[in-house]
Amino acid sequence: MTLKELEIGKSAVIRQVGGEGALRQHFLDMGMIPGAEVTVVKLAPMGDPMEVQVHGYELTLRLAEADQIEIEPIGQRSRSHVGVDRARDPDHPGLGESGKYHSKAGEHPLPDGTILTYALVGNQNCGKTTLFNQLTGSKQHVGNFPGVTVDRKSGVIRGYPDTEVTDLPGIYSMSPFSSEEIVSRNFVLQDKPKAIINIVDATNIERNLYLTMQLLEMGIPMVVALNMMDELVGNQGSIDINAMESMLGVPVVPISAAKNEGVDELIRHAIHVAKYQEPPLKQDFCDRDDHGGAVHRCIHAVVHLIEDHAEQAGLPVRFAATKAIEGDPLILEQLALDVNEQEMLEHIVRQMETERGLDRSAAIADMRFDFIERLCEQTVIKPRESRERIRSEKIDRILTGRHTAIPCFIGIMVLVFYLTFNVIGKWLQTLLAMGIDKLSALTDSALTGMGVNPVIHSLVIDGIFTGVGSVLSFLPVIVTLFFFLSLMEDSGYIARVAFVMDKLLRKIGLSGKSIVPMLIGFGCTVPAVMATRTLTSERDRKMTILLTPFMSCTAKLPIYSFFVSVFFPGKGGLIMAGLYLLGILVGILAALLYKDTLFRGEPIPFVMELPNYRLPSIKNVAQLLWEKAKDFLQRAFSVILIATVVVWFLQSFDLHLNMVSDSADSMLAMVAGVLVPLFAPLGLGDWRICTALLSGFMAKESVVATLEVLFGGSIAALLSPLAAASLLVFSLLYTPCIAAVASVRRELGGKWAVGLALWQCLIAWVAAFVTHGIGLLL
């Protein structure tokens, strides 16, 4: 019997994990090992993928992968070491006891002035970035779905100028399964930080400790931060910190990163282990009596076999040994074993497999989880079921229910657009626009009264105020949209959207995980492109990158809002929703084309953790809104200001630098006139529109600024509603801004970036041409 056949609510014991390669290793690292107990929680609304519970946390996988996992059903779900009724262990005694958890014998003090470098390592969605912000005072983006951090970020620990801590992407093990996991592993192995801060989710401790064990094998000074201890204790759970420290051989500090509790103690221990280079006291977790000691003998034999090669390659010997046994190709390549040594390694491993009754990868994973189980039996009292889990299950009955998930998603998105463009955002935009107009009128009167030179007067009023001011008025709309997206992300809902939409996305050649970068793309294409690093398949990653620009970013909102308010008043929500849906539809058509041409093959397996729902943090939401508002203002007073001044200059002077009374005689008209024949079939045969669209390549917001400068507020009289509709469609689909193209170049290379820009311009031209043609027929 396979996991695919197990009924919802039923439990079973895993007997064998099929498949091969990185995916199988990832399943093992996530706890899907022979002997583990697994329970089917539910199926996605479309029947695939499925959600299962293993080692106390929720994991999603497709039915095709579940069909490769052989199981043996059990009558009743076990409750091993859950809700044990015994006296509560004493709380962690005091904060930062001087040297209590440190081994003086292992000290090797670094010279004064040495920069203490730290790697902040942990599972996805365990609170790493929140802790990083507390340690450094930084304001990195925080979310409640796996894969928020996709690149490493560094900062100095507050109060300790000779330190540098690097926030690495979340990983489940040191086996490279995706590009962000490779980033994390390479940093630890190659950059060789002075110490590791391993952050562990105390509410999901079994899975998190799997990575901890691999980090300990590396022999690097380390401190373990047990995060979310407030949630564990609040649910009547506890951890014997001192006993856990004794069994792991490193300092263990209970913290709540979100509340900044225990962070000072964590810093003191981290400084100590790095300054005095105290290695972990324990690296050997295999029991010589476990299953006849087969794994124990294998690991120690391989350690002796590869010891000299590991030292030459700069690899921790114990870590290299377990990875060599697992068959990690990157580690084996670095070890550079000769033919005889390779044969000896293979003989040792095969003998272990025969004695243990498991293949090499499963045997190593089982050894780690066996130690974790013993550790938790002795040190952890877990609540039967947390309030957060109970709450999540109740919410999921509606938001991921078979008949309610899709309607809920559509309803939520419609509500977001309605409130953004018709209610909250529109009201705030009107207020800000009135304020800018009043300030512009006051400035105009002041400059006139002072007798300022007409050229300067025109620059300030017709250039800066008309251009930059028109863009600034759309700030409330952008902030409002980001507010709602932040709520969805911070609550954990976006991860559910990926679960719900996986089967649908698979029909166009993508995985459900691709929904996360594409949803981020509605905010900004640049972080959306970076977020594709969480995808483990190069095929899926490239395909998703090429599709994210079709998700209309907030930088285009000023264009939509401007034309909708001028040409289609009272229909803002409808027009906006139509534009967003059109972008999604064109993206789907492009995906179907890519699927059968550039990216043949199957999408990656869908393996993802579903976090508990959490109440959005007011601090996190406010911080994100401030960052987005600040970024918008910086662009408005840098790129857009410069573009506005340049456009004003070029449309105000001719080639001889004489000021012109008619902008049709200006330098700008001459340059943009070259493009007029290209845009004429779209109903956009005006050099001023061509200029505005060109300026949009620098920043999409500058399209409105340029139009305001060139048309001088008379655009409604000079353009027809049909031309406005054509322009809206072209603006929706043509090449993203230069920052987005640069991010594509960074991820895929220059040829892909140029190709994407030209391809989107072609699609935009065709779509606008069709729009204009249909309009003429109506």
Go through the PLM ranges and name each one:
Residues 160, 185-252, 559:
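Conserved C-terminal guanine-recognition region of P-loop GTPase G domains, centered on the G4
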Residues 232-285:
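Canonical P-loop GTPase G-domain recognition
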Residues 408-419, 481-486, 564-566, 579-593, ...:
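Hydrophobic core segments of alpha-helical transmembrane domains in multi-pass membrane transport
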Residues 91-173:
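Conserved G1/Walker A P-loop phosphate-binding module
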Residues 550, 554-577, 739-749, 770-778:
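Transmembrane helix-loop junctions at the membrane interface of multipass transporters and ion channels
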Residues 355, 362-366, 382, 423-464, ...:
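Extended, low-charge hydrophobic alpha-helical regions
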Residues 249, 276, 282-452, 659-668:
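Extended helical scaffolds that flank P-loop GTPase cores
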Residues 434, 438-442, 495-525, 600-624, ...:
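Juxtamembrane inter-helical linkers in multi-pass membrane proteins
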